[in-house]
Design a protein with these regions (language model features):
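Bacterial N-terminal signal peptides
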Residues: 7-17
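Extracellular/periplasmic carbohydrate-active domains that bind, remodel
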Residues: 18-525
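Positively charged n-region of N-terminal signal peptides that target proteins for export
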Residues: 1-5
């Protein structure tokens, strides 16, 4: 089939779709207004639409209150401009979730209206303006399980009872140009949760929420053999006080071929109407815990992650990659061996005003493998603390993985432990004031390449890079702003095969347990 025919088919598809039959909920007795419950009326329109071959169920301008609605095969729920589907504030009006679908095909939600879950109706104030659930909630706002060919486009979603949009075991999914606006004090208000799904594209979405903005996971025993793969997230704006893009925490099964690109991670302003928590006397912004988190702690394989062209503002931790062994969150049973994280590429990332160093870590006996960081520019917050430089970082083998689990690390910008095959190319690190910590720390590391590590004059400590028990490392083209070469701090008894290319041997610092002469070779070009 030639390109011209393919283009013609793609051009005609929207026309064919738009010519499908429409079913206006007003024709089924639905009434706008807070005093009317329209669950049965809207469901009748959905049932008829599906039974007659599919089409659009139209929600016109106005506010329509409803309990649980079940989407069925062939049905596209269309919210016209000015339409609001309002979740009921009464638990008894729900079976489970506001909108749900099970084993359906060719379904979706589209238009320019609003879906509101009435989450406040199921919360109570806990402390410091935060909320908790005070009774059983209806479930997720939108829940789609084992469905195929799903399209969610254009709509605005807000105030879910728990997660906003949850897809479990689905395939061929397009989520495009949706807006999510959730209060930052809401409990477990994830934006989009992709669980054990395949062939998913999320693009052009603007998400503002209290919990994970976009998260890939799998914690469901029914789908633990179904990999989460071929997932693309691109062109999105993500604002969260938790994690903005995350793989984890619940990770059973496999995660393959994941792409996150061309997106912005933002911070919430204390003046925002939805940001009513954790605003201290200095009125500092509400930062995301992490911009990017990749976690395997329940025995899963994460293989093939590409992250590119990301801008982050005011995050606590820019990049958090964690391989550990806590046991999955369902059975509470540890796998016999930890999972694996390998083949990760992170390139063209710009970070402004981060709090904590990025970390890539595993646990003793396991390694995060084949990670490339390229063209990373990071501006960090200063932290002068003599004790912090030599701080011992706990392993926390079975702890809940969190980007802030260690707080301030002994490195300013990047902390690597239990890693194998790491490449860092053109890494620029700046600090907003003087700091005496190394920029990078490698501990129990193998096959390391650092080409082009650039630091500013605010690094005032004894070493730019610390190596502990590191084997086969290559450093080249490393400079600070005034053109001086780096000091390297070698610790431990197992450092070997370390080459400092075009580096003055006099500017290598060694602990007594490590012999510079035996461990390091110098290549002057």
């Amino acid at each position: 089939m030639n390109k011209g025919i393919i283009t013609l088919i793609l051009t005609l598809l929207p026309v064919i779709s738009l010519s499908a039959e429409s079913y206006n909920i007003l024709d089924f007795g639905a009434k706008a207004g807070k005093e009317y419950l329209n669950t049965d009326k809207i469901q009748a329109a959905i049932d008829k639409c599906s039974s007659e071959g599919g089409g659009y169920v139209v929600i016109p301008r106005g506010e329509f209150v409803s309990g649980t609605l079940e989407l069925k095969s062939g049905v596209m729920l269309q919210l016209e401009h000015g339409a609001r589907l309002q979740g009921s504030s009464r638990k008894e009006d729900y079976t489970k979730h506001l909108i749900r679908a099970l084993d359906a095909e060719d379904i979706g939600i589209c238009g320019h209206g609003v879906i509101d879950g009435s989450g406040y109706s199921f919360w109570y104030v806990k402390e410091n303006g935060l909320y908790e659930h005070d009774r059983p909630v209806p479930g997720y706002m939108i829940y789609l399980e084992n469905c195929k060919r799903i399209r969610v486009t254009g709509v605005r979603m807000s105030n879910p009872e728990a997660w906003t949009l949850h897809l479990l075991g689905c395939s061929d999914v397009t989520i495009r140009d949706i807006t999510i606006r959730n209060p930052l004090h809401g409990p477990t208000n994830d934006g989009i949760d992709i669980q054990a799904c395949q062939d998913v594209t999320i693009s052009g979405c603007d998400i503002y929420t209290s919990d994970d903005a976009i998260v890939l996971k799998n914690r469901h025993p029914k789908y633990n053999m179904r990999p989460c793969k071929n997932i693309t997230v691109t062109g999105c704006i993500l604002t969260s006080v938790c994690n903005c893009f995350k793989i984890g925490t619940e990770t059973i099964g496999q995660f393959r071929n994941i792409v996150f690109s061309n997106s912005t991670v933002r911070f919430a302003q204390p003046t925002d109407s939805l940001a009513r928590i954790r605003v201290n006397e200095t009125k500092r912004p509400l930062r995301a815990s992490s911009g990017i988190s990749i976690e395997s702690v329940d025995g899963s394989l994460i293989d093939g992650v590409v992250i590119s062209n990301i801008t982050m503002e005011e995050v606590k931790c820019p990049i958090f990659i964690r391989l550990a062994n806590r046991g999955d969150g369902v059975q509470k049973v540890k796998p016999t061996v930890p999972g694996k994280i390998k083949n990760v590429l992170i390139t063209n990332v710009n970070v402004r005003n981060a709090w904590f160093a990025s970390s890539i870590t595993a646990i003793p006996g396991s390694y995060v493998e084949n990670v490339t960081l390229s063209n990373i520019n990071v501006t960090m917050r200063k932290m002068i603390d003599a004790k912090l430089v030599d701080r011992v970082v706990d392993e926390k083998v079975d702890a809940y993985p969190d980007a802030n689990m260690w707080g301030n690390l002994p490195a300013t910008s990047f902390y690597f432990r239990h890693v194998d095959d790491i490449a860092c190319n053109m890494i620029r690190c700046e600090i907003d004031g003087e700091d005496n910590r190394p920029a990078m720390i490698f501990d129990d590391a193998k096959d390391i390449i650092v080409n082009g590590l650039i630091l500013d004059e605010n690094y005032i400590g004894d070493a730019a890079v610390r190596l502990t028990d590191t084997h086969c490392a290559r450093f080249s083209n490393c400079d600070i702003k005034d053109g001086l070469k780096f000091h390297y701090d070698l610790r431990g008894e197992l450092n070997s095969d370390i080459r400092l290319i075009d580096t003055d041997p006099a500017k290598v610092r060694s602990e007594k347990s490590c012999s510079v002469e035996q461990s390091v070779s110098f290549v002057i070009k």
